[in-house]
């Protein structure tokens, strides 16, 4: 639609004026991703407050051929929620759709709207004695709609799975305004094609997720957290298997961090204490949890059972020469101090440099091989690049990130593209994935064409054309009808 005033006037037919933003300064925070890599432009940002308003917008967009870019908390890392620079898009922010429509203790589920902040869902469930385990560094800003759109992972995937695994049902608004109600909390529903999972991870390119039914779990009442030094990734993988067996498969987190990353974290955040000195080659942050309150209380010998389990595991690791050093959190303050190291890792690398960030996954058995290959390939391109990888070892998801040499490097910006290619070359050697939990967005569209099975890519193109024949739903993301 060429006439801006006419377009805005049309939006006012089903949205309040206060829910339509066109001022450039007011729109600015929504037009750039949090890392400052992607910046776009838009005609307006709209903030619907109901599924009915989203439906009206989607009908209006189809009639007038308006590009729609859905956005949640704008915490994405691949530019999936940022429009292009044509200025032809309207950003659809779900941030004002925050109702919790249903909470069922009997069914262990809650039905929530797409704009609900993840951390607020944690609190809501815990206040009622249940647990929503999806846990990301961006939990204070990201929305459940965005988590679903990207099939987000996080630190608890090893026990509870990705967002897809936590979702029971969806409400989705299709282009043209039809509302598809798959919003059932049923645990079993074998009535035809699994359309729900088609939209999870589709990044708003097939329809707009407006609400979801999500699984809840028994609230963990006892935890034991340790930070452990290991010589290499292969040893860490071995320890994961041992901890799963020792704890009765109750490992909630198993996070890998190399010494190069840790040096940057402690440099950029000097108030965070360094618990292991000298720094080992790798540290693993590991946590086990129990829903049994007695596991966190002194037994007849005065010992805490869950801490005893962790201590016995650590002792076995020391005896086997697999663990070089370790610290065990004895209270919630110490636990948070250990988690602060991991949770500050993304911001630390951002402060230190303009990082080359990746989100790859490989089988656990290939993690060491991939790490070594990628490091070798990277140093062929840029010998002084620092590998600041971290990730969720339990599910094979590694953020193999790079930063420039300490003190800066004038060639860094020029070589970023070649560094990405070096990492992806190593990834191809171990049959890994270029996206584990961040999605494709606009950053990885071309890479996807090069690595996806051609038949699968053709099927994806057909599905996209079916739901969005004119290519106006989050254009330029994941795949387009022109591919």
Language-model segments: which ranges?
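Noncatalytic alpha-helical scaffold of FAD-dependent oxidoreductases
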Residues: 1-483
């Amino acid at each position: 639609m060429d006439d801006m005033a006419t377009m805005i006037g049309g939006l006012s037919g089903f949205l309040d004026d206060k829910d339509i933003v066109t001022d450039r300064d007011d729109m600015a925070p929504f037009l750039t991703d949090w890392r400052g890599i992607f910046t776009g432009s838009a005609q307006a940002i709209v903030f619907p407050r109901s599924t009915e308003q989203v439906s009206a917008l989607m009908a209006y967009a189809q009639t007038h051929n308006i590009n729609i870019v859905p956005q949640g908390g704008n915490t994405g890392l691949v530019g999936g929620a940022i429009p292009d620079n044509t200025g032809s898009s309207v950003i659809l922010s779900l941030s004002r759709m925050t109702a919790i429509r249903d909470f069922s203790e009997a069914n262990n589920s809650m039905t929530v709207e797409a704009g609900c902040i993840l951390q607020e869902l944690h609190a809501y469930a815990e206040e009622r004695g249940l647990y929503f385990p999806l846990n990301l560094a961006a939990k204070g800003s990201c929305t459940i709609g965005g988590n679903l759109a990207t099939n987000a992972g996080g630190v608890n995937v090893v026990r509870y799975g990705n967002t897809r695994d936590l979702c029971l049902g969806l409400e989705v608004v299709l282009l043209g305004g039809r509302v598809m109600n798959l919003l059932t909390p049923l645990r079993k529903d074998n009535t035809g094609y699994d359309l729900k999972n088609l939209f999870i991870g589709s990044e708003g390119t097939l329809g707009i997720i407006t609400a979801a039914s999500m699984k809840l779990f028994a609230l963990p009442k006892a935890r034991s957290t340790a930070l452990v030094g290991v010589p290499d990734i292969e040893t860490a993988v071995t320890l994961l298997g041992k901890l799963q067996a020792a704890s009765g498969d109750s490992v909630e987190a198993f996070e890998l961090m190399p010494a190069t990353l840790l040096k940057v974290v402690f440099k950029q955040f000097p108030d965070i204490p360094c618990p292991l000195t000298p720094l080992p080659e790798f540290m693993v942050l590991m946590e086990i949890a129990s829903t049994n309150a007695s596991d966190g209380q002194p037994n007849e010998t005065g010992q805490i059972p869950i801490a005893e389990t962790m201590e016995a595991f650590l002792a076995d690791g020391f005896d086997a020469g697999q663990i070089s050093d370790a610290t065990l959190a004895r209270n919630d303050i110490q636990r948070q101090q250990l988690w602060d190291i991991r949770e500050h890792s993304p911001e630390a690398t951002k402060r230190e440099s303009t990082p080359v960030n990746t989100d790859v996954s490989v089988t656990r058995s290939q993690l060491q091989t991939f790490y070594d290959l990628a490091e070798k390939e990277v140093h062929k391109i840029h010998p002084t690049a620092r590998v600041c990888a971290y990730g969720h070892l339990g599910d094979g998801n590694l953020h193999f990130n790079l930063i420039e040499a300490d003190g800066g490097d004038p060639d860094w910006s020029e070589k970023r593209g070649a560094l990405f290619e070096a990492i992806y070359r190593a990834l191809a050697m171990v049959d890994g994935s270029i996206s584990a939990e961040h999605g494709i967005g606009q950053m990885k569209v071309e890479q996807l064409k090069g690595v996806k099975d051609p038949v699968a890519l053709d099927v994806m193109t057909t599905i996209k054309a079916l739901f969005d024949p004119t290519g106006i739903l989050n254009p330029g993301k994941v795949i387009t009808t022109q591919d």
